[in-house]
From Swiss-Prot:
Binds DNA as a homodimer. Interacts via the ligand-binding domain with LXXLL and FXXLF motifs from coactivator proteins. Interacts (via ligand-binding domain) with TRIM68. A zinc finger (NR C4-type) spans 417-434, 453-472. It holds the Pfam family zf-C4. GO terms for biological process: androgen receptor signaling pathway; regulation of DNA-templated transcription. Composed of three domains: a modulating N-terminal domain, a DNA-binding domain and a C-terminal ligand-binding domain. In the presence of bound steroid the ligand-binding domain interacts with the N-terminal modulating domain, and thereby activates AR transcription factor activity. Agonist binding is required for dimerization and binding to target DNA. Detected in somatic Leydig and Sertoli cells in testis with high level expression. Also detected at lower expression levels in forebrain and heart. Residues 1-416 are annotated as: Modulating. Transmembrane segments: none annotated. Keywords: Cytoplasm, DNA-binding, Lipid-binding, Metal-binding, Nucleus, Receptor, Steroid-binding, Transcription, Transcription regulation, Zinc, Zinc-finger. This is Androgen receptor. The record marks 578 as: Interaction with coactivator LXXL motif. Residues 526-757 form the NR LBD domain. It comes from Aquarana catesbeiana.
Length: 777
């Protein structure tokens, strides 16, 4: 909606060119103020009583007259008035004199020869186009405008218009009152030319002191007689409801350029004044057109394409109440008259009843349509609007920031699958995985299938290569924490037991199995395959040390390679422990403590198994690229420790340990050393350790056909774990001594190994930890 605002009122017709920018409004205001001053002085005739009360009103085509009658309210003109109302002596004096101009305007008029003269004003009035500014002043204004890159074409259309001057705001509409004037009187408007209908405009004139102060109403609420009513200057003078004289101004967001008046500078002059109850006089530009609903979102006025929800507002737009800030006795008026905002647009023809269509008020409705929003939508938060939106919420602006959102607003980013890094579809088998890994794990875990990796158990498992190696994929599923629940295991065990019984009907008919013998065997048979599949899947992969076998063996080279191998294996040990069934039920601090104290024993136990499987316990198989023979054992200066480790590897062969028994022994070996003072959740630790011992017993019972032979084996296998503890303490002591003279012997220690050796090994050597044995002897 377009409203053409000048310093003297609302213009009837639009100018030839839209004025934009703060500098153009500034020069326009100064120029029109000078024109209005000269025009008011030129149009006065002291000999006529009418000329003392009638003043030209600035319009775009035809100047209208402004009249003032003291003590007379607003009235609609009934045509041409033969006799004007009498004017008071105060109103007969010229309303615009040089004293009403500011000091700057006086200096411009005095220096540039712009003072009005009687002869010039009369000739200018007769020609109908008065002289606006002197030639030198014109040249100055034009030169400044050209230097600032502004156009002077818009100023040429206003050469015949006289305007008021506002003192407290640089760009503003007509003033309501000043400190000296407390009331405004508006008289009827006389038009001699009735050949075509034009919209009439009201006027503001200075008057004397009124009975009531500005902005106040009678306390008892009684109405005054028509002759004694006065229009307060707090807001724009309003006409009666339904009249064409009622109008409003749509205040758009503009530059808040405020020029304080002289009375504001002295705060001590008014000690009782409330400086927080006044509205800020924010003036708009000369002509502003805003159609974006974002500017009005959430405010009391609504958007320009919808009506306000507050009563008393016929359309969106704030009240055009201009105030001289912080004036004594000033109050903010509330408008309840719907005709306040029913002013017409001069360039759009009205309907037959004087009403204007929606297209006249909202020219963009045909393209955008009406916006009906009963409930505020959620604003789209951006980096630049965060602080601004917070301020708007504090001010009560909680509406729509933007009605369009990016596509990722409605579809938040998905979390990746912990197994193949695809988009996870939910929590399956106690882990956040995708649907493909869910189906794969169900088939692999319940089907008791044996998968073998064609590589080194280190295949890359992602969205595109997850089907290449099922063995590594299943291992990664177990590492992610996927596990079959207890109910699932029990159900699966019952089904397999039923199939086993149905498979041999003749045997079951021939002889009955004792109940005390059948239940342990069924439970052991049903539960062990699934549990062993989990342990097999999470088994740490074989890691290479990076040792260069082409170089001659030396103490520093062999020990540095062993330390590097320990660093790499430690990473896999941590991953294996976290994937160990039941290990995450421990307290977080207990998990770290167990790993830091048992990492050396786990590596010794695993190295003994690899030596037994790969080289038949003849050598120490630390890694595929690092195998210790007799020569390297002597060269490393740790021959006694190597002999003990080789003896441990030989015990695997003497006992004929199976891979399933080794997997079940590996869990208890991680839970074989704790601090002397105990753990934070010692009860949970003891339950977890006892469960692994029971699982080892079930594996032994399941693999041995003769139950009588299971007891000696169950005694020997845990004893194998007990033989790891002396080797662990001896090797830790050797490592700590080597760490103290590492720089002297040129042996490299990786960062993680250095931290553990310097912090945890002294606790082990000082007796602050205790090993847990399965047997007393």
């Amino acid at each position: 909606m377009e409203v053409h605002i000048g310093l003297g009122g609302v213009y009837k017709q639009p100018p030839g060119k839209m004025i934009r920018g703060a500098f153009e409004n500034l020069f326009l205001s100064v120029r029109e103020a000078l024109q209005g001053e000269r025009r008011s002085a030129a149009s006065l005739d002291t000999s006529s009583p009418i000329s003392a009360c009638v003043h030209p009103h600035p319009t775009w085509n035809e100047p209208s007259t402004w009249t003032e009658v003291r003590g007379t309210p607003w009235r609609e003109p009934q045509g041409a008035q033969p006799d004007p109302p009498p004017c008071s002596p105060r109103s007969q004096a010229p309303q615009f004199t040089l004293s009403s101009c500011t000091t700057e305007l006086k200096e411009i008029l005095g220096e540039q020869g712009g003072m009005p003269e009687e002869g010039n004003s009369e000739s200018a009035s007769k020609e109908g186009y008065p002289e606006s500014i002197s030639d030198s002043a014109k040249e100055i204004c034009k030169a400044v405008s050209v230097s600032l890159g502004l156009s002077m074409e818009a100023l040429e259309h206003l050469s015949a218009a006289g305007e008021w001057q506002r003192g407290d705001c640089m760009f503003a509409g007509p003033p309501h009152h000043t400190m000296g004037a407390q009331t405004c009187q508006v008289a009827e408007e006389d038009k001699s030319d009735t050949s075509f209908s034009q919209y009439r405009e009201g006027a503001f004139r200075r008057a004397g002191q009124s009975t009531y102060s500005a902005g106040k109403a009678p306390e008892d609420g009684s109405s005054l007689p028509t002759e004694d009513k006065e229009q307060p200057c707090t807001d724009m003078a309003l006409s009666e409801p339904g009249s064409l004289r009622s109008r409003g101004m749509e205040v758009m967001p503009s530059l808040t350029l405020y020029k304080p008046t002289a009375f504001m500078e002295d705060a001590s002059a008014y000690p009782g004044r409330d400086y927080y109850s006044f509205q800020m006089a924010l003036a708009p530009h000369g002509r502003i057109k805003v159609e974006s609903p974002i500017e009005f979102a959430g405010s009391a006025w609504g958007g320009p394409s919808r009506y306000s929800e507050f009563p008393g507002f016929s359309h969106c737009g704030p009240s055009a109440n201009w105030h001289s800030l912080f004036e004594e006795g000033q109050a903010t008026a509330s408008y309840t008259d719907s005709s306040l905002y029913s002013y017409p647009r001069s360039h759009v023809p009205a309907g037959p009843d004087g009403e204007f269509s929606a297209e006249a008020w909202y020219p963009a409705t045909a393209m955008l349509g009406r916006v009906h929003m009963a409930v505020p939508m959620r604003p789209r938060m951006t980096h630049g609007w965060t602080a601004t939106l917070g301020i708007r919420r504090r001010l009560g602006w909680t509406g729509v920031e933007s009605t369009f959102y990016p596509i990722d607003y409605y579809f938040p980013p998905q979390k990746p699958c912990l197994s193949c890094e695809d988009e996870a579809s939910g929590c399956h088998y106690e882990a956040l995985t995708c649907g493909s890994c869910k189906v794969f794990f169900k088939r692999a875990a319940e089907g008791n299938q044996k998968y073998l990796c064609a590589s080194r158990n280190d295949c890359t498992i992602d969205k595109f290569r997850r089907k290449n190696c099922p063995s590594c994929r299943l291992r990664k599923c177990y590492e992610a924490g996927m596990t079959l629940g207890a109910r699932k295991l029990k159900k699966l065990g019952n089904l397999k037991a039923q199939e086993e019984l149905e498979g041999s009907p003749g045997q079951s008919e021939g002889r009955e199995m004792p109940p005390n013998m059948s239940i342990p065997q069924l439970e052991g048979y049903s539960c062990q395959p699934i549990f062993l599949n989990v342990l097999e899947a999470i088994e740490p992969m074989v890691v290479c040390s990076g040792h260069d076998n082409n170089q001659p063996d030396s103490f520093a080279l062999l020990l540095s390679s062993l330390n590097e191998l320990g660093e790499r294996q430690l990473v896999h040990v941590v991953k294996w422990a976290k994937a160990l069934p039941g290990f995450r039920n421990l307290h977080v601090n207990d998990q770290m403590t167990v790993i830091q104290y048992s990492w050396m024993g786990l590596m010794i136990f695993a190295m003994g198994w690899r030596s037994f499987k790969n080289v038949n316990s003849r050598m120490l198989y630390f890694a595929p690229d690092l195998v210790f023979n007799e020569y390297r054992m002597h060269k490393s200066r740790m021959y006694s420790q190597c002999v003990r480790m080789r003896h441990l590897s030989q015990e695997f062969g003497w006992l004929q340990v199976t891979p399933e028994e080794f997997l079940c022994d590996e869990g208890p070996s991680a839970l074989s050393i704790i601090p002397v003072e105990g753990l934070k959740d010692q009860k949970c630790f003891d339950e977890l350790r006892m469960n692994y011992i029971k699982e080892l017993d079930r594996v032994i019972s399941c693999k041995r056909n003769n139950p009588a032979s299971s007891s000696p084996r169950f005694f020997n296998l845990p004893k194998l774990l007990g033989s790891v503890q002396p080797i662990d303490v001896n090797l830790v002591q050797f490592t700590f001594g080597l760490f103290g003279k590492a720089q002297m012997v040129s042996v490299d220690f990786p960062e993680m190994m250095s931290e553990i050796i310097s912090v945890q090994v002294p606790k082990i050597l000082s007796g602050r930890v205790k090993p847990l044995y399965f047997h007393s002897s």
